[in-house]
Amino acid sequence: MAEHRTKPSELDQGKCDADDNVKIICLGDSAVGKSKLMERFLMDGFQPQQLSTYALTLYKHTATVDGKTILVDFWDTAGQERFQSMHASYYHKAHACIMVFDVQRKVTYKNLSAWYTELREFRPEIPCLVVANKIDADINVTQKSFNFAKKFSLPLYFVSAADGTNVVKLFNDAIRLAVSYKQNSQDFMDEILQELENFNLEQEEEDVPDQEQSGSIETPSEEVASPHS
């Protein structure tokens, strides 16, 4: 089980190897409550960082999974979702996705299909958790059947950022699934992107006179990932 232990500022990040870091992205229409959910989960133990260059907000969090310290980067869209599409860099090396809709606005549920299609274009295998937010407005929605999650065999969470219902469970499960994905399977999309990156660097080096060349290209270790449950 994943649980909050300490603030990132209190952790000696240098002691953590690369496997102790995961990236979790949030998707969904504007105003469905993505940021509010993160703030509810992290409460006072977060320091959101606005990255205007990439039009996103980054939330850092520290969790413990099976006795191991995990540094978690939660990526929020910061308004970019109003264009109904995200830049490819938003998806790059993400280990799990939290996809949110507002139970009071049917259009946000209908748009899940478009978000999911784009997600799978860049991250074909990562775990995706579907979130029905704002159930505090009408608890009866928890009795409804949302076929989108069933169609793609995705876990569905009924939550409320307002009163905290199921928020901790949602994020703890997302962290656990992200860690499992990273540790247990290979994501070929990352391999392809890395190969293209290396190829471009090699091409650039070929264009530079021998006497001006310096440094070397390091091949990163393979990132593993597993079929999500």
Swiss-Prot record:
Residues 200-229 are annotated as: Disordered. Disulfide bonds: none annotated. Gene3D superfamilies: P-loop containing nucleotide triphosphate hydrolases. The keyword Iron-sulfur does not apply. GTP binds at residues 28-35, 76-80, 133-136. Keywords: GTP-binding, Nucleotide-binding. InterPro entries: P-loop_NTPase (IPR027417), RabL2 (IPR041835), Small_GTP-bd (IPR005225), Small_GTPase (IPR001806). The keyword GTP-binding applies. SUPFAM superfamilies: P-loop containing nucleoside triphosphate hydrolases. GO terms for molecular function: GTP binding; GTPase activity. Plays an essential role in male fertility, sperm intra-flagellar transport, and tail assembly. Binds, in a GTP-regulated manner, to a specific set of effector proteins including key proteins involved in cilia development and function and delivers them into the growing sperm tail. Belongs to the small GTPase superfamily. Rab family. Interacts with IFT27, IFT81, IFT172, ATP6V1E1, HK1, LDHC, MAPRE1 and HSPA2. This is Rab-like protein 2A. It comes from Pongo abelii. The gene is RABL2A.
